Curated annotation (Swiss-Prot):
Main localization (coarse): Golgi
Biological process (GO), any one: intracellular protein transport
Region (Disordered): 211-243
UniProt organism field: Schizosaccharomyces pombe (strain 972 / ATCC 24843) (Fission yeast)
InterPro entries per UniProt: TRAPP_II_complex_Trs120 (IPR013935)
Physiological role: Component of the TRAPP II complex. TRAPP II seems to play a role in intra-Golgi transport.
Designated name of the protein: Transport protein particle subunit trs120
Length: 1210
């Protein structure tokens, strides 16, 4: 590999230009060049000395056999370095080598001619040779020329032969150095570099004399300030130049010996040059000599040769006198500190040289000198000390071995950074673009080595800013020469890149983008929401700079990538104007590339383009399809420790999948977001599916700025199985088609997170073009986000029903409350599959009212029964036959549906369920045809009041019932009341907005106490928590149950209906909403046992008896009972209002209580009891009968009215 030009020991390397001569393939030339670079270090002990000692022994290699001559093989020539060759010899090309491929057909005369041309172009080259590689033996005699050398073949020891060839070249080079030494010695005047050239502008004077302290030394040498030489005559300048030439000649001798590997001789000459230059005030050459002296010290340290510092140099650094003059091993720490002190002096000398206009240091030389020393510090920092590892890398550019712990002094990063940044200045603006880019590149490389990635990228931005206008100007000049527009040149340049790999600038672009938070190699992005200090503006400026660079190179693909990257990372913080300008550039670049025949696309910038995906079913609104799975047999449940496990249920719910039908189209609603302030054109979008094959529709639309757009896409499965909708394949204008997933909303914020740490060891990765190209092909982001997919099960073709006819037009149907009617529908099987099972189901809004009513916490048991009765026994819709039927393809069937208009059933739904399955199938699918029905319900006739009275004819078995009806309608209505037991009907005409009464006799209901004590039934099979009102009604006693059961008997016996005069409308009158009072309940019912009693005297009924005369109390019991009953007699004297006993008032012959025996055949029992009165007065006699066994739970029966008995002596 080529040596680093900014290495600290770069002045000790001989520049050798290697060129291909004749017909040489690129790959062969690279391999031959690699062979030369393998043996670039030539030991002086291996160089033959006969030729070198012919004239002089000054460059005899055996004088210092430990020395090495190092070649730096170049493949290009920099003509701008020629003006500095006399100042720094390491810039001069001393060796010219032409590589010839012996396996190709070559012409020797042409090779020699080419070599002569290059010798004339490089007149200072001391050696010019052609090396023929891989030459067959039979062709060796062809290349018989003095300047042509036969190189190694594949069957030879390649390294040995190459080293032998270079040793011969080195011997000839040393002979040339001897001649050059004599010519230098013969010179009378040696001038400093000409700084009048624009690219060799002198260093500008700085006000600060900052220097870096060495470790352990607080003293710094003080240099005497010399006034600037502003004006001198020609003669005086000439005399001064002559006086300065002695020191400069010694400096050039030292440079030659340094290049020749004779380091001790170079140290001697540099020491002399320092002394002479110091005496004459030649600051430029004194600084150069002192700088090269430090290079010699580093080389000697690598050779482990002790060095004795000359006294004139030690006098400049008194603190190092004892440490550096002692004999023994060289101390690395002391040497590094000493070099640091010398480097400070060199820097001051170069600064002082700016006061001498004719001898000022060129800005290029100063920056390179600074960077060479900074490179030394960087290597020491990387090797954790100035040790053998660091020296091997500095001298031979060997790989740096890992070191766990620092054993010597390691300069800190801040110190190294200060030295690197001192190479920057205004003088760089006057350098040529090549030298300027080389300076900025070296600074960026060193800053990256110490971990200052932000400053490294800053230098890369300076490099881009310097390179872009030069490239644009070059394009303009080429277009001006050819007389065409510069855009045509750009188009031709871009077209020439179509078939080649043109991503060479991507590593540079990628690194800059990474450092400014636009892209990271690990896939993370910088979240700009947490960087509020103008970060987005900085990113915008950086991208503009990179886009300008790509534009100057006609790299349209990189322009599109950069703009897409800007939209990806800065969309949340970029201003509207920035977004609009970027999108205009994106559109212009894409259209220009397309017109030029270059088809390139950038990755789309928004990975979360889809915000939601919803299933909306069939695209035909008239036929809403609902598919569900019916399980014929219950699935077995695994035994577990829990009675109910909610997690299992949640898992089952999550595993539920929608069901699709083969060859039936379904639609999805997809919501796309556009976070930009510009309109984005979606050229194509369709659903992305996995699993079974399906046909997907395509769509195109435009997303408005800062909006969420909704579009509908359809999919038609073509076979049975599982179908997964994973997202959408979207093609945006100028972008690659990308699969957009649907992500969980809670995980989207994880895709962007703050990444402000410094990058570590990314340079090696960035050098790989494959890595960079893959990185820019798809924008990376967090891959651990959860995606959502719509999973479906595709089943075989299913029957499809449609409504062919209905007897009423669409709209609301007008009905009165509880009016009955009939709806006629004709359904047709429009599919090619037979519907083997078709059933009719109904839904209406009264169910919601029922659920709301039963949710009342104060609802009682009887009210709950009324609601359940209306919900379950009085459905809104009924069908004549509830048995399933079948329809063949194309067949029609007429369905008659009866309707009962309940008050809360304004909205209804008729469902025709169709399916195809065999009787033995346990699982099948059904499809519902939904027909909505809207009812407009109004009041017609309702019961305003009801009452029951005792029969006026005195028959206790009958009562009178009064029903008061009110007509809400605008026409007269006929109301009919019918009794079920007698089948009698009573009708009355009720005028509009008026009421009328119907009065009729009704036989009273006989109810036993057991029937009354029955619990109020619950018609619902569902289990629910009893409300407080329901519990209270259950615990309530006899009254509520008696009222409930009597009402039930009454509603079974009495029905009321209404009809119009034309008999077109009719309906029933709902009577359950009215409450039955206790009085009405008693009048409507009679108990199963009745008591009649009277007083008998001489077999006649009397009400008055005489005292002390016996009379009879006759008790007559009617009814039946399954068990024995017990009666009780009691009386009360009215004048005293106190109960009496058998000892005062009245006397009973026996006990007051006795048993009455009933059986099925004995329904009438008469009992006579003898009594007499011995006290006059008025008495009320009471009789009560009750159950003998269950007295506490039985309801006693009393005499209807107490017997009034008058005892009077008269």
């Amino acid at each position: 590999m080529e040596f680093d030009f900014f290495s600290f020991v770069a002045p000790s390397r001989v520049q050798s230009l290697v060129l291909p001569f004749g017909r040489v393939r690129r790959k062969s030339f690279s391999s031959y060049l690699q062979l030369l670079r393998r043996v670039s270090h030539i030991q002086l002990s291996d160089v033959p000395v006969a030729t070198a000692t012919r004239k002089s022994s000054s460059f005899n290699p055996l004088a210092f056999p430990l020395g090495r001559l190092v070649y730096n093989f170049l493949t290009s020539l920099d003509d701008q370095q020629a003006l500095l060759e006399e100042f720094e010899y390491f810039r001069r090309v001393f060796v010219l080598i032409g590589i010839v491929d012996g396996s190709e057909e070559q012409e020797v005369e042409q090779l020699c001619s080419t070599l002569d041309v290059w010798r004339r172009r490089i007149p200072h080259a001391l050696v010019a040779k052609c090396i023929v590689f891989n030459c067959p033996e039979d062709k060796e005699n062809i290349f018989n020329a003095p300047n042509i050398i036969i190189g190694p073949r594949s069957d030879f020891s390649i390294n040995s032969v190459m080293r032998s060839i270079l040793c011969d070249i080195t011997a000839e080079l040393l002979e040339g150095f001897s001649s050059l030494e004599f010519s230098i010695h013969a010179r009378s005047v040696i001038l400093s570099p000409i700084t009048d050239m624009p690219h060799l502008a002198p260093l500008q004077r700085k006000n600060s004399n900052a220097s870096i302290h060495s470790l352990g030394s607080s003293s710094r040498p003080t240099l005497t300030r010399t006034p600037s030489i502003t004006s001198r005559s020609v003669n005086s300048v000439t005399e001064r130049s002559k006086s300065l030439s002695k020191g400069r000649i010694e400096n050039q001798f030292g440079q030659l010996y340094l290049l020749a590997g004779r380091v001790p001789n170079a140290l001697k000459h540099f020491s002399t040059a320092i002394a002479l230059s110091k005496a004459t005030g030649d600051f430029l050459w004194q600084g150069l000599s002192l700088e090269l002296f430090t290079v010699c010290l580093v080389i000697m340290a690598h050779l482990h040769v002790d060095v004795q510092i000359p006294p004139n140099i030690l006098s400049m650094f008194p603190s190092y006198n004892d440490r550096l003059n002692a004999f023994g091993p060289l101390k690395f720490d002391a040497l590094l500190n000493f070099i640091t002190e010398m480097r400070n002096v060199v820097d001051q000398l170069y600064q002082k040289s700016t006061l001498q206009p004719n001898d000022a240091v060129p800005g290029l030389c100063f920056s390179e000198s600074i960077l060479r020393y900074a490179h030394l510090l960087t290597v020491v920092y990387s090797c954790k000390g100035f040790n053998d590892n660091a020296l091997d890398h500095i001298i031979a550019q060997a790989p740096i071995r890992p070191v766990k712990k620092a054993t010597t002094y390691v300069p800190n990063k801040a110190t190294i950074c200060q030295w690197i940044m001192r190479a920057q200045g205004q003088h760089l603006n006057s350098l040529s673009i090549r030298e300027r880019c080389r300076i900025y590149g070296a600074m960026a490389n060193m800053l990256g080595s110490i971990g200052f990635s932000r400053l490294r990228v800053k230098m890369l931005r300076e490099l881009v800013a310097s390179l872009t206008p030069v490239l644009l100007e070059t394009r303009r000049q080429n277009a001006s020469k050819n007389g065409i527009h510069p855009e045509v040149i750009a188009s031709h340049t871009a077209q020439s890149f179509k078939s080649t790999h043109y991503c060479n600038i991507l590593p540079l672009i990628s690194e800059i983008c990474q450092e400014y938070g636009l892209l990271k190699t690990d896939g993370s992005l910088l979240n700009p929401e947490l960087t509020k200090w103008g970060w987005s503006n900085l990113q915008f400026d950086v991208l503009n700079e990179l886009i300008s660079l790509c534009d100057s190179l006609s790299d349209y693909r990189s322009i599109l990538l950069l703009i897409s990257l800007f939209f990806l990372t800065s969309v949340q913080t970029a201003s509207s104007s920035q977004q609009i300008s970027m999108f205009k550039a994106f559109r212009k670049t894409y259209l220009f590339a397309s017109n030029a025949g270059i088809h390139i696309n950038a990755p789309y910038w928004d990975p979360f383009m889809i915000t939601d995906l919803k299933f909306i079913g069939s695209s035909e609104n008239a036929e809403l399809i609902h598919q569900r799975l019916r399980n014929g047999l219950p699935k077995s449940i695994e035994k577990g420790p829990f009675i109910y496990n909610p997690f299992n249920r949640r898992q089952d719910q999550n595993q539920s999948k929608s069901v699709l039908v083969v060859d039936e189209q379904v639609a999805f609603s997809i919501y796309f977001r556009n976070p930009l302030s510009v309109s984005v054109e979606v050229q194509d979008v369709h659903l992305e599916t996995k699993g079974v094959s399906a046909k997907c529709s395509h769509s195109t639309f435009t997303m408005r700025p800062l909006s969420i757009e909704r579009t509908t896409l359809t999919v038609t499965p073509t076979e049975t199985g599982e179908l997964h909708i994973v997202g959408c394949r979207v093609k945006v204008f100028g972008c690659e088609p990308i699969l957009q997933y649907v992500y969980e909303a809670k995980d989207k914020h994880k895709s962007l997170h703050v990444y402000l740490e410094k990058s570590k060891d990314v340079n090696a990765e960035l050098r790989s073009l494959d890595t960079i190209d893959h990185l820019w092909t798809y924008f990376p982001f967090k891959k651990d986000l959860k995606t959502k997919s719509f999973d479906c099960i595709v089943i075989a073709s299913q029957p499809k029903l449609s409504l062919a006819f209905q007897n009423l037009t669409s709209g609301k149907f007008n009905f009165a409350e509880y009016e009955t009617g009939e709806l006629v529908y004709v359904i047709e099987n429009t599919s090619f599959v037979e519907a083997s099972h078709i059933s009719v189901l109904f839904e209406d809004s009264s169910s919601k009212a029922f659920e709301q009513a039963i949710a009342d916490k104060s609802i009682t048991a009887d009210r709950l029964y009324e609601l359940q009765f209306e919900e379950f026994n009085l459905p809104t819709f009924t069908v004549e036959s509830s048995q399933p039927f079948s329809l063949s393809p194309g067949e029609r069937r007429e369905i008659h549906i009866k309707i009962r208009a309940k008050p809360n059933s304004q909205e209804g739904l008729i469902l025709f369920e169709s399916s195809v399955h065999k009787p033995e199938d346990t699982e099948f699918y059904v499809r519902r045809l939904r027909i909505p029905v809207s009812l407009n319900i109004s009041k017609r006739v309702d019961l305003k009041q009801w009452s029951a009275f005792m029969d006026t004819e005195g028959d206790p078995s009958y009562c009178l019932v009064l029903l008061n009806f009110y007509n809400h309608f605008s026409e007269p209505l006929f109301v009919t009341v019918k009794t079920a037991s007698t089948d009698e009907s009573r009708s009355v005409l009720i005028k509009p907005k008026a009421d009328n009464v119907i009065l009729f006799r009704l036989k009273r209901f006989i109810m036993s106490s057991e029937e009354i004590n029955l619990d109020i039934p619950n018609l619902s099979t569902k289990q629910f928590v009893l409300s407080s009102g329901f519990k209270k009604s259950i615990e309530d006693s006899y009254t509520m149950k008696k009222r409930f059961w009597i009402k039930e008997y009454f509603l079974k016996e009495v029905q009321a209906s209404w009809k119009t005069d034309d008999n077109l409308h009719h309906g029933e009158i709902y009577l359950r909403n009215h409450i039955l009072s206790d009085e009405m309940a008693n009048n409507l019912s009679i108990l199963p046992i009745r008591i009649q009693a009277w007083v008998s005297y001489d077999s006649e009924k009397v009400t008055t008896v005489c005292p002390r005369e016996p009379f009879k109390l006759v008790l007559e019991f009617f009814g039946h009972a399954d068990t024995n009953m017990r009666y009780k007699i009691s009386w009360t004297q009215l004048n005293t209002q106190a109960n009496t006993s058998s000892f005062n008032g009245l006397i009973l012959d026996g006990p007051e209580e006795d048993i009455v025996c009933f059986n099925n055949s004995k329904c009438h029992v008469v009992i006579e009891r003898n009594m007499f009165a011995y006290t006059t007065g008025m008495y009320n006699i009471f009789v009560r009968i009750f159950n003998e066994e269950l007295q506490l739970l039985s309801q006693p029966v009393d005499l209807d009215e107490p017997i009034l008995l008058i005892v009077d002596a008269k």
